[in-house]
């Protein structure tokens, strides 16, 4: 369990790859412990992008408040720093009302930045740069981003572990924004402790094939629920919906709208892209400090999560 005494407020987090049941577990824990959910999904912030982002439905919330959802139009930029500030305000408000803040989502950069209290640069960051870097990370994976940093700033890369994607992106952001190497200045280090006393629960399946089957089934259900209509909306506004246009779940159908690929082919590409994304999510969270992993397929997964949370809260 990852804990810190910087703040007495307990914060719970439910993380893991796509299609592992994070939303349902978050609701169960909120019902059990009087909590409210803070979404840690970079795409669920956007209005109108519901099916492709697997956004929680009103029925699925069971009346539990869900925050950081449907806040922006798809043409509005939103950075990691924006999320950290937003989540901090939400955490303070939820805790002040005697409720338990529960961070739920698979955007590892959001979760890690919030829980670890990453400091962001004081320099002016060009509009869209952080969103672009986050999209590149999702598309290319952490190894490619680290390789780019090695080429741009070998000294900074040598001082950063390849799996510390937060600092890798910070260094790349500085280089792209200023044209200067971060190693040329005094690097801003991460705070030594997390700003919240936290328990991080991770969901995964023991057999990778289980996860892949769930992902394939989810894509099929999304198509039945109207994913193609959402993808067409993003395609039609791709010049302004730049973040959404790079998101998994929408861009895979652009060839279909352009008449260069069949729908089934695009759906298969989405399934493969989702599987690849799940692998990158696992890589991220497996290297994140303090995650307590649960077998998502186990009948007692929710019961174990409740027990761990109860023990965590009792230590407060």
Residues of each region from the PLM?
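Phosphate/pyrophosphate-binding catalytic cores of soluble transferases and nucleic-acid-acting enzymes
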Residues: 1-316
């Amino acid at each position: 369990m990852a804990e810190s005494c910087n703040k007495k407020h307990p914060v719970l987090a439910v993380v893991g790859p796509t299609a592992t049941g994070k939303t349902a577990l978050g609701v169960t824990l909120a019902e059990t412990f009087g909590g409210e959910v803070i979404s840690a999904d970079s795409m669920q912030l956007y209005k109108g992008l519901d099916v492709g982002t697997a956004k929680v439905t009103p029925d699925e919330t069971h009346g539990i408040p869900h925050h950081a959802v449907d806040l922006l139009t798809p043409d509005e930029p939103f950075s990691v720093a924006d999320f950290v500030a937003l989540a901090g305000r939400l955490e303070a408000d939820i805790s002040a009302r005697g409720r338990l803040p529960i961070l739920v989502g698979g955007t590892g950069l959001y979760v890690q930045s919030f829980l670890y209290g990453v400091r962001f640069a004081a320099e002016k960051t060009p509009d869209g740069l952080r969103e672009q870097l986050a999209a590149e990370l999702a598309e290319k994976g952490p190894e490619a981003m680290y390789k780019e940093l090695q080429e741009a700033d070998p000294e900074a890369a040598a001082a950063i572990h390849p799996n510390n994607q937060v600092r890798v992106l910070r260094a790349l952001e500085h280089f792209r924004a200023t044209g200067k190497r971060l190693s040329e200045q005094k690097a801003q280090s991460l705070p030594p402790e997390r700003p919240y006393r936290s328990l991080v629960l991770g969901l995964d399946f023991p057999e990778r094939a289980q996860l892949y089957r769930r992902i394939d089934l989810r894509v099929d259900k999304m198509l039945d629920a109207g994913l193609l209509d959402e993808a067409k909306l993003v395609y039609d506004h791709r010049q302004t919906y730049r973040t959404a246009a790079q998101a998994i779940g929408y861009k895979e159908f652009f060839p279909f709208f352009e008449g260069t690929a069949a729908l089934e082919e695009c759906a298969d590409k989405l399934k493969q892209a989702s599987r690849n994304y799940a692998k990158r999510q696992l890589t991220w969270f497996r290297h994140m400090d303090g995650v307590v992993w649960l077998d998502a397929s186990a009948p007692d997964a929710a019961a174990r999560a409740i027990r761990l949370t109860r023990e965590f809260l009792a230590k407060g």
